[in-house]
């Protein structure tokens, strides 16, 4: 039983109170340590290991990450990452970092710095030590006493995330643009290639780069054209050339014969003709050029496509030769009374299929007698009626081709001029013996 406080003297009262306090103290209070331990944020004291250990906020904080984000614990904190993000732990096999010692001594340096061995404050590289809160899509840049989260080139920050910039919206490319994550690529249409700035397109000269043209190549903007030499035409494939058969287009290209050749054609003439102005055929006058084989006793007569050697003296009894082409029947010869007084030899040539009627030869009287009348007729050589005589006047007449004739062919026509004088009872005749050569062609 404790003594009554009012009955005790003052000194005894103080001792009694002291004993009462000491006697009521708990045995546990006497076992408390005389110091305490404090850990930094994200860590808690582990009494067993006597060190600070990491707090797994993903387990201790309800709904630490919202929405479709997943919680990733790390030393001293946690991260909220997309569920598709991959996390590589212990990349170098070094194991977890050593336990953080108790923060018994405060950091004497300003935020973002830490003391070194010489007690100097050095910058903390938050990026290298993973002490930043930059998103996986961001780049961490260390700064003196701090750090900065930036977006890579080709990205821009929208909210907390870096989003790809669609550069194609800004028409950086001249032709086509392909957007890429963080970048873009320009492409050109066929026939163009990227210029030095990788944005503009310049024309490709396909002709200098081995375009598949068989003959001629013409470069144009963005493409090329194949062309062929004269005498060729472009094939359906647009590259190769095929010969044009000009001879098959028309039968009038050449006067005689058309010969097709690669890329061209040529005209040929028959024997006895020569080419004139590349397409026409002209008769070769062998008599004038000396390209004949007539003897001195013969006369060379040219006709279309050839020549004929005739005897210089063509007079037959009772006629005698009085000049190169004229034969005379003497009046003193009784055999000449019923014959033409003279025969003159002439030669001419015409082409085949000549248009009719056609004037081919004119007969002219060489002598005119007063009161005489001249009549002209075909005496011989016109059995088929291919010719007829049209008298022009008293002294001349025209030999007319009545029907088209085809050569090679030869006519010998005796064209007779009969001279009559009724007052003097005079009648005489003379013959022009005309040899008509019909050429084998229409030229």
Swiss-Prot record:
Keywords, sorted A to Z: Basement membrane, Calcium, Disease variant, Disulfide bond, EGF-like domain, Extracellular matrix, Glycoprotein, Repeat, Secreted, Signal
Cell location: Secreted, Extracellular space, Extracellular matrix; Secreted, Extracellular space, Extracellular matrix, Basement membrane
One of the record's GO cellular component terms: extracellular vesicle
Site residues by UniProt (Cleavage): 87-88, 90-93
PTM characteristics: N-glycosylated; contains mostly complex-type glycans. Not O-glycosylated.
UniProt GO BP: aorta development; aorta smooth muscle tissue morphogenesis; elastic fiber assembly; negative regulation of vascular associated smooth muscle cell proliferation; positive regulation of aortic smooth muscle cell differentiation; positive regulation of collagen fibril organization; positive regulation of smooth muscle cell-matrix adhesion; regulation of collagen fibril organization
Record-linked InterPro entries: cEGF (IPR026823), EGF-like_Ca-bd_dom (IPR001881), EGF-like_CS (IPR013032), EGF-like_dom (IPR000742), EGF-type_Asp/Asn_hydroxyl_site (IPR000152), EGF_Ca-bd_CS (IPR018097), Fibulin_C (IPR055088), Growth_fac_rcpt_cys_sf (IPR009030)
Cysteine-cysteine disulfides: 58-121, 65-80, 71-109, 127-140, 134-149, 151-162, 168-177, 173-186, 188-201, 207-217, 213-226, 228-241, 247-258, 254-267, 269-281, 287-300, 294-309, 315-327
Annotated signal sequence range: 1-23
Impact after mutating residue 126 to K: In ARCL1B; slightly decreased protein abundance in patient dermal fibroblasts; increased transforming growth factor beta receptor signaling pathway in patient fibroblasts; strongly decreased secretion; decreased elastic fiber assembly; loss of interaction with collagen type IV trimer, FBN1 and LTBP1; decreased interaction with LOXL2; new fragments proteolyzed by ELANE; new one fragment proteolyzed by MMP2
Residues the record marks as carrying a glycan: 198, 394
Domain EGF-like: 36-81, 123-163, 164-202, 203-242, 243-282, 283-328
Top-level taxon in the UniProt lineage: Eukaryota
CDD domains: EGF_CA
Gene Ontology molecular function: calcium ion binding; extracellular matrix structural constituent; heparin binding; protein homodimerization activity
Result of altering residue 279 to C: In ARCL1B; loss of secretion
Database matches in Gene3D superfamilies: Laminin (2.10.25.10)
Effect on the protein upon substituting residue 397 to T: In ARCL1B; increased N-glycosylation; introduced an extra O-glycosylation site; does not affect secretion; decreased elastic fiber assembly; decreased interaction with collagen type IV trimer, FBN1, ELN, LTBP1, LOXL1 and LOXL2; new fragments proteolyzed by ELANE
Similarity annotation: Belongs to the fibulin family.
Subunit record text: Homodimer; disulfide-linked. Multimer; allows heparin binding. Monomer. Interacts with FBN1 (via N-terminal domain); this interaction inhibits EFEMP2 binding to LOX and ELN. Interacts with LOX (via propeptide); this interaction is strong and facilitates formation of ternary complexes with ELN during elastic fiber assembly; this interaction limits interaction of EFEMP2 with FBLN5. Interacts with PITX2. Interacts with ELN with moderate affinity; this interaction regulates ELN self-assembly maturation stage. Interacts with FBLN5 with moderate affinity.
Job of this protein: Plays a crucial role in elastic fiber formation in tissue, and in the formation of ultrastructural connections between elastic laminae and smooth muscle cells in the aorta, therefore participates in terminal differentiation and maturation of smooth muscle cell (SMC) and in the mechanical properties and wall integrity maintenance of the aorta. In addition, is involved in the control of collagen fibril assembly in tissue throught proteolytic activation of LOX leading to cross- linking of collagen and elastin.
Disease connection: Cutis laxa, autosomal recessive, 1B: A connective tissue disorder characterized by loose, hyperextensible skin with decreased resilience and elasticity leading to a premature aged appearance. Face, hands, feet, joints, and torso may be differentially affected. The clinical spectrum of autosomal recessive cutis laxa is highly heterogeneous with respect to organ involvement and severity. ARCL1B features include emphysema, lethal pulmonary artery occlusion, aortic aneurysm, cardiopulmonary insufficiency, birth fractures, arachnodactyly, and fragility of blood vessels.
Protein name in UniProt: EGF-containing fibulin-like extracellular matrix protein 2
